[in-house]
């Protein structure tokens, strides 16, 4: 992040604008909408600015710029077509540690103006940091069409009730829940329809409901949401998953959850890494189960965020059993499992009419006392094997499949960090699986079957060419 997005209170604060032409006029209009006291330094004024000066709306200093004019100023804008003058304004302001913007000269800016969607008091600011202003403008236009004009009225009503809500709902979590429910419910529809009196009545009813809820024991208010985070690319997170993450009081997450997905969690939610990887846990599974129950019994909305889908080799079922036995309300938000997302990004269809009529999901990390795999069934042809957490067992997997009849030349793929910018796909044969797995960064998915050969034709993610040369050695393809 090259710029920190902040909202400055300019009401009754002096802002100096150097320049009196068309560009200065546009900037001054924006400053006045924010309540700034504008001083213009220019030898002449464009007609709109001259009219504002006559009306007493701006102060005009009809002289050349001197550094002394910066005394007592909050921020500075240079909006002239004189590069030398603009540079002088920048240097003088910078020496005095004043925020300064030289229009259309980013290196001479200590702040920049974003594209704005104005639904005052709700304001959305968009910036590309000066790298792609047209892209920022297009995004603003998109948001203009998506955000209803009634949002401003909704925010004004909320502001008028804010102090009263604080006196009746004493805890921050209770107030947050109240506002979240209010803004997505009937209240929003009434405001949008212009029925403001009815909207305030709905607000009062929701406040009563929230107060009644606060009388319940904490354990009755807490809840757990088991959310699948997908394989890594934040774009694969479900809409429902995002909504639940944005409402969480606390989030328990694994190492497999990508940083991009974690960035979507509500900013002030507590985050606890329980750090699960194959055979390695920051917390034992039993302690994770107990922590989920404990946090929910404190009245918190708990999100258990798991890579992929929580019910596919994620032990999500075990966690929910503990939650259910404690009598806690819960919900499940499915996620894109690694076998589906990672293979799609690698250009490997799990089934194909010519190659595989079935797919089997397998974990390489079984219980030590568990039953052994049915290798005879797994070694059959015309099926795809997708093996989670299998890199440490790659040698055994290869040996057993070959021993039970699968061809040693069966195509295999080891896909590391799938769907992420640093995804790697290693292609080889079943007899080379141990070597490929040893090379692969983790986490990695093993894919075994004839469908792997289609990678050479339809790989698409991050590549400049859809084909990968084949030779007798494993091919390592970096799809970063």
UniProtKB/Swiss-Prot annotation:
The gene is cysG1. Its EC number is 2.1.1.107, 1.3.1.76, 4.99.1.4. The keyword S-adenosyl-L-methionine applies. Residues 222-480 are annotated as: Uroporphyrinogen-III C-methyltransferase. It comes from the Bacteria. InterPro entries: 4pyrrol_Mease (IPR000878), 4pyrrol_Methylase_sf (IPR035996), 4pyrrole_Mease_sub1 (IPR014777), 4pyrrole_Mease_sub2 (IPR014776), CobA/CysG_C (IPR006366), NAD(P)-bd_dom_sf (IPR036291), Siro_Cobalamin_biosynth (IPR050161), Sirohaem_synt_dimer_dom_sf (IPR037115). The modification Phosphoserine is found at residue 128. In the N-terminal section; belongs to the precorrin-2 dehydrogenase / sirohydrochlorin ferrochelatase family. In the C-terminal section; belongs to the precorrin methyltransferase family. Residues 1-203 are annotated as: Precorrin-2 dehydrogenase /sirohydrochlorin ferrochelatase. NCBIfam families: cobA_cysG_Cterm, cysG_Nterm, PRK06136.1, PRK10637.1. NAD(+) binds at residues 22-23, 43-44. The active site is at residues 254, 276. One of its GO terms (biological process) is cobalamin biosynthetic process. S-adenosyl-L-methionine binds at residues 231, 307-309, 312, 337-338, 389, 418. The keyword Oxidoreductase applies. The lineage of its organism: Bacteria, Pseudomonadati, Pseudomonadota, Gammaproteobacteria, Enterobacterales. It catalyses: uroporphyrinogen III + 2 S-adenosyl-L-methionine = precorrin-2 + 2 S-adenosyl-L-homocysteine + H(+); precorrin-2 + NAD(+) = sirohydrochlorin + NADH + 2 H(+); siroheme + 2 H(+) = sirohydrochlorin + Fe(2+). Keywords: Cobalamin biosynthesis, Lyase, Methyltransferase, Multifunctional enzyme, NAD, Oxidoreductase, Phosphoprotein, Porphyrin biosynthesis, S-adenosyl-L-methionine, Transferase. Then it catalyzes the NAD-dependent ring dehydrogenation of precorrin-2 to yield sirohydrochlorin. Finally, it catalyzes the ferrochelation of sirohydrochlorin to yield siroheme. It comes from Pectobacterium atrosepticum (strain SCRI 1043 / ATCC BAA-672). This is Siroheme synthase 1. Pathway: Cofactor biosynthesis; adenosylcobalamin biosynthesis; precorrin-2 from uroporphyrinogen III: step 1/1; Cofactor biosynthesis; adenosylcobalamin biosynthesis; sirohydrochlorin from precorrin-2: step 1/1; Porphyrin-containing compound metabolism; siroheme biosynthesis; precorrin-2 from uroporphyrinogen III: step 1/1; Porphyrin-containing compound metabolism; siroheme biosynthesis; siroheme from sirohydrochlorin: step 1/1. One of its GO terms (molecular function) is NAD binding. Pfam families: CysG_dimeriser, NAD_binding_7, Sirohm_synth_M, TP_methylase.
